[in-house]
Amino acid sequence: MGKLLRKPLNERIAPGVTLVQDINQGNSPLSYVGFRLIELEEDAVYQETLDGLECCIVALTGKISVSEGDHVFSEIGTRANVFEKIPTDSVFISGGRAFQVKADAEKARVALCYSPADRNLPTTLIKASDNSIEQRGKYQNKRLVHNILPDVSEVASSLLVVEVYTDGGNFSSYPPHKHDHDNLPAESLLEESYYHEINPKQGFIFQRVYTDDRALDETMAVEHQNAVIVPEGYHPVGVPDGYDSYYLNVMAGPKRVWEFHNDPDHEWILERD
């Protein structure tokens, strides 16, 4: 199966460009989802040509400019810190195209979310105001959700991207749910990656990834800027008191539909008043 928990790489890959996370088909069990996290110093430029993949470029922190062909989106990004808990700007780019990302401020943190390009689609700016915002859950199961590329969006062909905030003492991706069988309308098959940040950053959260038969059952202490791969199974997150959790989810599979199946042992939690 390979390691599900990925620590930061912190590799300098170009002048002023640091690769923090890199998840792809070659170094993981994933077939549909890819993820990169880069940090850019002021005026640094990251360049890439997409080969069979589409990409959502998320301006996590700082101001960036994204260019692809005749498209130039300047000074996008809304936050100095993800824990400002406001939506941010993103850019979607379809497969077979070359793009570059430039830092317009002292430092920028950028997420690159990948999945197979099933169709040729227009390059699109996804403004912060385009994100739908949800408050989900109750009791100790509350979280704030920013939907960047939900399944109702027609911007992408296979990619799903969402941000989730969970306050200390709460659980998210909970009750435990999974989406690893192509059994629509009951359940869709979607791989997933989690990129985590924690406030204050010396904290940690817990994430368990497990299947019904426990052939896969891994519980991880996840630290700031770690990533977790979910090729299959349930994948709940628990946040200790005193710390807040942020994660960016990337999902993709054979059909661009998010339908999940709750662990029946814990579904009773949803039935409480």
Curated annotation (Swiss-Prot):
UniProt-listed Enzyme Commission number(s): 5.3.1.30
Highest taxon listed in the record's lineage: Bacteria
Xref: InterPro entries: Deoxy-glucuronate_isom_IolB, IolB_Bacilli, KduI/IolB_isomerase, RmlC-like_jellyroll, RmlC_Cupin_sf
Residue pairs linked by disulfide bridges in the UniProt entry: none
Record pathway: Polyol metabolism; myo-inositol degradation into acetyl-CoA; acetyl-CoA from myo-inositol: step 4/7
Record GO terms (molecular function): 5-deoxy-D-glucuronate isomerase activity; glucuronate isomerase activity
Pfam families assigned to the protein according to its UniProt record, in alphabetical order: KduI (PF04962)
Leader sequence residues: none
SUPFAM superfamilies: RmlC-like cupins (SSF51182)
Keyword list, A-Z: Isomerase
GO biological process: inositol catabolic process
Uppermost EC category: isomerase
Reaction(s) the record says it catalyses: 5-deoxy-D-glucuronate = 5-dehydro-2-deoxy-D-gluconate
Protein role: Involved in the isomerization of 5-deoxy-glucuronate (5DG) to 5-dehydro-2-deoxy-D-gluconate (DKG or 2-deoxy-5-keto-D-gluconate).
The family this protein is said to belong to: Belongs to the isomerase IolB family.
NCBIfam families associated with the record: myo_inos_iolB
Protein name: 5-deoxy-glucuronate isomerase
